[in-house]
Design a protein with these regions (language model features):
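Alpha/beta-hydrolase superfamily serine-hydrolase fold, recognizing
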Residues: 1-195
Length: 195
């Protein structure tokens, strides 16, 4: 299980600005298949939507975001009715290249499962805004996938913004989200509809 506690540090700058944050954990391979991981992410969004009014949250201002594999999941759940928009940081949008990598040693995906769970092949039906970010110092494949996914959304008439954070790599890009003046932080605030 990817622990939500590992990412609690990301919430601090938003909480200090009066923005509520829900951190979601999810199972990892080999304990779950990619289909199960994506289904779990959908279930988490539905649970949050049901509980949010009880917690005093505004159900019209729910934005899903994620980093790396969480960035992949954020795009896979974007059709959930309760979501206003999405933001993906350093996500993976085409899973077929993973089939021959060490990552698939734990995921055990076949070609059909990779296709079902590749955002670039499963564009959402809704026209919710999605902001995509990658670091300029990310691996070329990560940057290519992000740029290709942005292009696919544009070609389908879906709203998308794509930006590369100068000098950021797969890990340091999170500093841009934590910093109130960072482009990613500001984009998330804008997707929420302002403070």
């Amino acid at each position: 299980m990817r622990s939500k506690n590992d990412f609690a540090f990301l919430a601090e700058s938003f909480l200090s600005s009066g923005i509520s944050v829900a951190l979601v954990g999810y199972p990892l391979g080999p304990d779950a298949t990619m289909d199960e991981i994506v289904a779990d992410a959908h279930a988490a969004i539905r649970y949050l939507a049901a509980e949010l009014p009880k917690l005093g949250g505004d159900p019209r201002r729910v934005v899903v975001s994620g980093w790396s594999s969480g960035g992949h999941l954020a795009t896979m759940v974007l059709d959930e009715p309760s979501l206003r928009a999405g933001l993906s940081i350093s996500g993976i949008f085409e899973l077929e290249p993973l089939l021959k990598s060490y990552v698939n040693d734990k995921l055990h995906m076949d070609a059909a499962m990779a296709q079902r769970n590749s955002p670039i092949l499963q564009l959402p039906k809704s026209s919710k805004q999605l902001d995509l970010f990658a670091g300029s110092a990310e691996l070329p494949e990560m940057r290519r996938q992000t740029a290709d996914y942005a292009s696919a959304r544009r070609a389908a008439g879906l709203p998308v913004q794509y930006a590369e954070i100068p000098g950021a790599n797969h890990y340091t890009i999170l500093h841009n989200m934590m910093n109130n003046d960072g482009e990613i932080h500001q984009a998330l605030v804008a997707l929420l509809g302002g403070r």
